[in-house]
From Swiss-Prot:
Binding site for ATP: 73-81, 96
Region Disordered: start-end pairs: 1-26
Induction, per UniProt: Induced by hydrogen peroxide and abscisic acid (ABA).
Phosphotyrosine: residues bearing it: 227
Family recorded in the similarity comment: Belongs to the protein kinase superfamily. CMGC Ser/Thr protein kinase family. MAP kinase subfamily.
Ranges for domain Protein kinase: 67-352
E.C. number: 2.7.11.24
Protein name: Mitogen-activated protein kinase 1
């Protein structure tokens, strides 16, 4: 992106009002930072080709080019994330360790999908994979280490902090999300899990979309497979188990995220499925019959028996939000996905006129192929596919 497109005052202080810097969120959507740790012991292994670190009692074993200091910056259900220096390139990276990555087939498939998708994509607003670190020995391949470009924080951390955000910040974040999403959708891919913690940021407000483990093709009919997208950002067609879904599901999520950014609290913080649907109808109103054409008869019956809600006035409910921003959000938060604004339509909306430049909003040169998922892969096949990805980054390693 042309640096000139950036608003002049988007240099951002560290979240948390000048105290501890925010967690350097890795592409795992890592949560809060684990704090700086000094004197982490490093031991060379496998004839000096690898280096082992002991972090939180976990062995972190990477190729020897990743030099100290290595710092834990996040922890999640998948494992641990550390920042490290690649001594060959001089670049700081975020390394995610996925421990026992092949124990659960669904998780292994998610890891493989994320690797293949991110290797296919090349865009300023999508986090890049820098390395898949091969195991010291192919026959004992259990843990997967993925190195991503390192970012300073994520949108969830910023929203929770006392970091002041100007209208220009929010506008610029929205623009970058849509710019990245245009590229993703052009590759025939739906992200399906957009939320603030999957939007990484650095101090000069560059934004990158991460976590493609739930991504799917836009033409897929096998609907709810492994579908666990965060409820608060879920489009109504997903809440109603619609058998068909489109790129419009991601647009709904972006509308929710933008309003959370403006309001500093989630727009629809549903406690469960039913509560989620109720919250969104309380704001945008009960849909009419024409808006329900896309859902099945069971879902239509269910909605008809719910208490009816009139649409609330967005300008009255959110008086602090710019009228053009309200207009765009209302077009994103449209119940019927067929009527919802597209990513291209959103980029061309007057609210983003100062940033929009169609010649600098690239699309993907070729659609992504999910063919590798067409057949049930064994654990060994998945290991081999990920191992081959590692060799692509490390051609000298055999």
């Amino acid at each position: 992106m042309d640096a000139g497109a950036q608003p002049p005052d988007t240099e951002m202080a560290e979240a948390g009002g000048g105290q501890q810097p925010p967690a350097a969120a890795a592409a795992a959507g890592a949560g809060a930072g684990a704090g700086m740790m000094e004197n982490i012991q490093a031991t060379l292994s496998h004839g000096g080709r690898f280096i082992q670190y002991n972090i939180f009692g976990n062995v972190f074993e990477v190729t020897a080019k990743y030099k100290p200091p290595i710092l834990p910056i996040g922890k999640g259900a998948y494992g641990i994330v550390c920042s490290a220096l690649n001594s060959e390139t001089g670049e700081q990276v975020a390394i995610k360790k996925i421990a026992n990555a092949f124990d659960n087939k669904i998780d292994a498939k998610r890891t493989l999908r994320e690797i293949k998708l991110l290797r296919h994509m090349d865009h300023e607003n999508i986090v890049a994979i820098r390395d898949i670190i091969p195991p010291p020995q192919r026959n004992s391949f259990n843990d997967v280490y993925i190195a991503y470009e390192l970012m300073d924080t994520d949108l969830h951390q910023i929203i929770r902090s006392n970091q002041a955000l100007s209208e220009e910040h929010c506008q610029y974040f929205l623009y970058q999300i849509l710019r990245g999403l245009k590229y993703i959708h052009s590759a025939n891919v739906l992200h399906r899990d957009l939320k603030p913690s999957n939007l990484l940021l650095n101090a000069n407000c560059d934004l990158k979309i991460c976590d493609f483990g739930l991504a799917r093709t836009t033409s897929e009919t096998d609907f709810m497979t492994e579908y666990v997208v965060t409820r608060w950002y879920r489009a109504p067609e997903l809440l109603l188990n619609s058998s068909e879904y489109t790129a419009a599901i991601d647009v709904w999520s972006v509308g929710c995220i933008f309003m959370e950014l403006m309001d500093r609290k989630p727009l629809f913080p549903g406690r469960d499925h039913v509560h989620q649907l109720r919250l969104l109808m309380e704001l945008i109103g009960t849909p009419n019959e024409a808006d329900l054409d896309f859902v099945n008869e069971n879902a239509r019956r269910y909605i008809r028996q719910l208490p009816r809600h009139a649409r609330q006035s967005f300008p009255e409910k959110f008086p602090h939000v710019h009228p053009l921003a309200i207009d765009l959000v209302e077009k994103m938060l449209t119940f019927d996905p067929r009527q919802r604004i597209t990513v291209e339509g959103a980029l061309a909306h007057p609210y983003l006129a100062s940033l929009h430049d169609i010649s600098d909003e690239p699309v993907c040169s070729s659609p992504f192929s999910f063919d590798f998922e067409q057949h049930a892969l064994s654990e060994e096949q998945m290991k081999d596919l990920i191992y081959q990805e590692g060799l692509a980054f490390n051609p000298d390693y055999q």
